[in-house]
């Protein structure tokens, strides 16, 4: 009988929701498309981001040590908090050409951890930030091969029609963003929200593959309910956010 596979430690990572208000109302978020040569979800649309590097801890940010830790709800050390903010800004520059001179302008939006069953795992902090005035993001044609501004609700509609490939955390994040009507609303909510690490749990529930999130009655550990707690696979193999049963 084979021994159970050891759980792979997650790699620290950061991703950024670059936001801009639209002249006709509402707002858009910038997304990039993975290369078809990518080892994970080739062709999927994602938010700019990547792994935290050791040298990220050496770069300054305009926040005190106390403010840094508060930004992450006390979940990270000062050095790790700084590394994640700097990594977020660096990845945006590398993938889109947009320079965020002050990483402290970004606020924590969510925190996702790849399930333990996966062989490649990431511990990713999602940040929300306003696109600098007059910035013109693009894509590097290497790691990402296309890019576009999308209304969150429109992106969800395109996903539902099979026109857009999204990973579950990206889908859930777009669903979360679609609740707001402006960049100010998103950033105000990010400043005020209590972020809990989301480590999805895959189960078959009532004959459907289901992703359980913290707060769900079937989730393996007790956590506060911060929103819908289930993402259920529907027709065409696409995921849909649903509220957990009472």
Regions found by a protein language model. Give the residues of each.
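N-terminal leader/linker segments that precede catalytic domains of diphosphate-processing enzymes
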Residues: 1-246
């Amino acid at each position: 009988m084979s021994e159970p596979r050891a759980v792979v430690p997650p790699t620290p990572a950061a991703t950024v929701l670059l936001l801009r208000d639209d002249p006709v109302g509402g707002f858009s978020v910038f997304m990039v498309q993975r290369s078809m040569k990518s080892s994970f979800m080739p062709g999927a649309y994602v938010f700019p981001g990547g792994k935290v590097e050791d040298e990220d801890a050496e770069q300054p940010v305009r926040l005190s040590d106390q403010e840094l830790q508060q930004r992450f709800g006390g979940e990270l050390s000062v050095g790790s908090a700084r590394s994640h903010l700097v990594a977020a800004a660096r990845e945006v520059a590398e993938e889109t050409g947009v320079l965020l001179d002050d990483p402290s302008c970004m606020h924590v939006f969510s925190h996702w951890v790849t399930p333990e069953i996966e062989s490649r795992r990431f511990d990713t902090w999602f940040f929300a930030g306003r696109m600098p005035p007059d910035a013109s993001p693009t894509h590097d044609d290497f790691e990402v091969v296309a890019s576009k501004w999308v209304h969150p609700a429109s992106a969800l509609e395109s996903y539902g029609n099979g026109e857009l490939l999204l990973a579950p955390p990206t889908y859930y994040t777009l669903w979360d963003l679609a609740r707001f009507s402006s960049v100010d609303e998103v950033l105000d909510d990010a400043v005020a929200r209590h972020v809990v690490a989301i480590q999805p749990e895959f189960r078959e529930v009532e004959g459907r593959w289901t992703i359980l999130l913290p707060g769900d009655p079937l989730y393996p550990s007790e956590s506060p309910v911060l929103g819908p707690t289930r993402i259920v696979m529907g027709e065409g193999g696409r995921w849909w956010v649903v509220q957990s049963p009472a």
